[in-house]
């Protein structure tokens, strides 16, 4: 998300690439492991890697005055986490320079 042409939320990027970074040990690096990002730990479980684990109901809308990004994180966790729904919503009110963050979960 941007405000007045400046980024409000950024990604720190990747570490230096090497063979291990593209191996089965990829998720031992902090830059790609979910426990070093702003993802919740649900009932002791972190988000899992792989195409099987993904957020759903991902949407983004934008107008001159407001930008909104919403997703349901439940699908990114193993069944053992026992999460039915975990909706995260970010709303940027551009003219007021306010970023509103909310989460609802079951």
Region roles according to the model:
Residues 1-106:
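Extended polysaccharide-engagement surfaces of secreted carbohydrate-active enzymes
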